């Protein structure tokens, strides 16, 4: 079962959207997560490398369950890296660590 705090990919319908983020709550009424549209992920990741240039960020969003098509854990698939792994490789910090302290120094 996917638990709050997990890094997830949320697929929505009407309109179709995909988000990367941290699951906060999954309930009968819907899903709450702190995330960013996947179309902005690479820009957000590039911005995380330059801490003084913060124009993109994750937003806390509630989506009614009728819009949720599926929720995936952000996991690697064979040789394809997860979004979290890509983030850590480019930024030098884990996603959870970055979200707790965006201006901190890289750990790598």
Summary of predicted features, one role per range:
Residues 1-108:
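Conserved RNA-binding domains used in RNP assembly and mRNA/RNA metabolism
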